[in-house]
Every structure is written in structure tokens, then in C-alpha cells.
């Protein structure tokens, strides 16, 4: 049975597409079949895949969660379907959350990022959807990182991923290149897969 992972954040610029594609590749490298459903009207994941010859897994455009079954079928029933959602777009985000076995909620560490994340997190918790917060685009020297860790770890409504996605020029330049796993993405992939084994 295909497990659905929806990457959701109502705030833009949090790295949802990068997380979706790079996580898919890291999970694929673990030996699992993956597919990505691109629900963002900007179609960033689709555009990424079209720039790469022999992209390693299928990415398809979707407009609603009812399209997920077609992606799964055409992807030969992958082990994991990762859904890249748009910022805003409440109807699609809601459908994607309801269809998910796990929601990943990427966020930066600025006060505005955390405020928006807590609003989204409260909404997901009201829906009863298993959720993990992923700190993304983070400068490890940032003092806010420790504060955010303490604040989110104290929140028992969602898991906080141990893996932190750092700010790196290389991470910003992956768009349009063939995805390859790195220690950071491999670590996050192991956490995500382990969540389904518990």
C-alpha cells in the first residue's frame, strides 16, 4: 500500500519543493519506489524534472487529492507518494492533509516562520493528522535555532525531526539538477521511513 506524505506549509519560501524532491530521492536510494505529486500551481517540481534527462522517479501535476490515485497507478503503486503543496491554497492543502499518512511541515527559525508554523500545526492537530516539523534553511550558528528547538520540542502535538536542513548555497542550486542524496537528506529519509515502522 502506498504511504502518502504531504509537505505542507501555508507560508511560501520554506523549501517545500526542495524537501519533496530531495526526500523522494533519498527514500528511493533506500530501495523504495517513490513518486511525487506536484500540487503547486507554479509547478516547480514538474519544471525541475523537465530540466533533467532520466529523472529518477515520476513527478505528476495534480489539482486535487482525487488525482493521487492516478499518480499511484501510473507510478506502479510506489511505496511512497510525496505531495508538494502550494502556499495558501487552503482547499488543496486540506485535501492533501486529509489524504496523508504523515504531514511534514518545513519551517525556518524566524519568529514569523514559527508563528505561521504554530498556526498551521494547530490546524493539523485539530484534524488529528500525524505531523512532523522539519527545520529547514537553517544557519546552524543561529541563536534562534536553540530557542525554536526548545519551543517546538515542548509542544507535544507534533514530532520535531532530528534532522535539520541547513542553509547552503548548494541546496539553493539543486533546482534543475538530477537529485542526489546527501547525509542530511539520507538522515531525514531514515526518520520518515522509521515513522512508518513504529
What are these regions (language model features)?
Residues 36, 83, 105, 133-135:
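Structural beta-sheet core signal
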Residues 139, 149-178, 196:
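Beta-strand-loop-alpha "switch" segments that mediate conformational coupling across diverse proteins
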Residues 4-14, 21-95, 166-176:
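P-loop/Walker-type NTP enzyme "switch/lid" segment
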Residues 89-110:
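Inter-motif core of Ras-like GTPase G domains
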Amino acid at each position: 500500500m502506498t504511504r502518502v506524505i504531504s509537505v505542507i506549509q501555508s507560508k511560501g519560501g520554506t523549501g517545500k519543493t526542495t524537501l519533496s524532491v530531495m526526500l523522494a530521492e533519498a527514500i528511493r536510494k533506500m530501495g523504495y519506489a517513490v513518486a511525487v505529486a506536484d500540487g503547486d500551481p507554479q509547478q516547480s517540481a514538474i519544471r525541475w524534472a523537465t530540466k533533467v534527462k532520466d529523472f529518477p522517479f515520476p513527478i505528476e501535476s495534480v489539482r486535487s487529492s482525487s488525482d493521487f490515485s492516478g499518480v499511484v497507478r501510473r507510478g506502479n503503486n510506489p511505496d511512497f507518494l510525496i505531495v508538494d503543496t502550494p502556499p495558501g491554497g487552503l482547499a488543496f492543502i486540506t485535501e492533501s492533509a486529509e489524504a496523508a499518512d504523515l504531514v511534514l511541515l518545513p519551517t525556518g527559525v524566524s519568529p514569523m516562520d514559527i508563528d505561521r508554523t504554530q498556526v498551521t500545526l494547530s490546524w493539523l492537530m485539530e484534524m488529528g493528522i500525524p505531523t512532523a516539523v522539519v527545520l529547514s534553511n537553517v544557519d546552524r550558528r543561529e541563536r534562534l535555532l536553540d530557542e525554536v528547538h526548545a519551543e517546538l520540542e515542548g509542544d507535544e502535538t507534533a514530532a520535531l525531526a532530528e534532522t535539520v536542513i541547513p542553509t547552503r548555497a548548494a541546496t539553493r542550486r539543486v533546482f534543475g539538477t538530477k537529485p542526489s542524496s546527501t547525509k542530511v537528506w539520507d538522515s531525514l529519509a531514515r526518520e520518515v521511513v522509521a515513522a512508518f515502522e513504529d
